[in-house]
Amino acid sequence: MRIGHGYDVHRFAEGDFITLGGVRIAHGFGLLAHSDGDVLLHALSDALLGAAALGDIGKHFPDTDPQFKGADSRVLLRHVLTLIHGKGWKVGNVDATIVAQAPKMAPHIDAMRALIAEDLQVEPDQVNVKATTTEKLGFTGREEGIAVHAVALLLRA
């Protein structure tokens, strides 16, 4: 078995929604990114790639490559799954913590878990997503962006 850790950050930018875990959430800002800015799926992808010793999302989906401009991070996550399956691994479980002062995540967590489970071909109880604030401290507390920490456990297929 293998474990991996992923971390990603995106700053807020002009827009009226963000996408987290594949779920579109109304917000006064968007997230600045080359792809769709789904910081949750980016952190999960990095955790999975790390566990399989396959590098990171920057290696597989560089922000200098125009083909990934505006890319759907769910498609990228499914590609990551193909890569780890190709190395003889399957997902045991994933766990992520969203760090954001706003918007409130609780109403969206179940939908995020369901989409992530679908994309990773696992049961929803193998996916955990939680959210916290930093009590208005730091860049997330000042509502300048969102950060996500994620871990993944891989098992031999």
Swiss-Prot record:
| Site description Transition state stabilizer, residues in chain | 34, 133
Q: Which residues bind 4-CDP-2-C-methyl-D-erythritol 2-phosphate?
A: 8-10, 34-35, 56-58, 61-65, 100-106, 132-135, 139, 142
Cofactor binding annotation: Binds 1 divalent metal cation per subunit.
Residues engaged in binding a divalent metal cation = 8, 10, 42
Tell me which InterPro entries the record gives.
Answer: MECDP_synthase, MECDP_synthase_CS, MECDP_synthase_sf
**What EC class is this?**
lyase
> Any idea of its EC number?
4.6.1.12
Query: Under the GO molecular function aspect, what terms does this record hold?
Result: 2-C-methyl-D-erythritol 2,4-cyclodiphosphate synthase activity; metal ion binding
Q: Which UniProt keywords apply?
A: Isoprene biosynthesis, Lyase, Metal-binding
Q: Name one GO biological process term.
A: terpenoid biosynthetic process
List the pathway annotation. Answer: Isoprenoid biosynthesis; isopentenyl diphosphate biosynthesis via DXP pathway; isopentenyl diphosphate from 1-deoxy-D-xylulose 5-phosphate: step 4/6
Q: Write down the chemical reaction(s) this protein catalyses.
A: 4-CDP-2-C-methyl-D-erythritol 2-phosphate = 2-C-methyl-D-erythritol 2,4-cyclic diphosphate + CMP
Q: Which cofactor does it need?
A: a divalent metal cation
Task: Name the protein family.
Answer: Belongs to the IspF family.
User: Its function?
Assistant: Involved in the biosynthesis of isopentenyl diphosphate (IPP) and dimethylallyl diphosphate (DMAPP), two major building blocks of isoprenoid compounds. Catalyzes the conversion of 4-diphosphocytidyl-2-C-methyl-D-erythritol 2-phosphate (CDP-ME2P) to 2-C-methyl-D-erythritol 2,4-cyclodiphosphate (ME-CPP) with a corresponding release of cytidine 5-monophosphate (CMP).
How the protein assembles, per its UniProt entry?
Answer: Homotrimer.
Q: What name appears for this protein in its UniProt entry?
A: 2-C-methyl-D-erythritol 2,4-cyclodiphosphate synthase
* Gene name for this UniProt entry: ispF
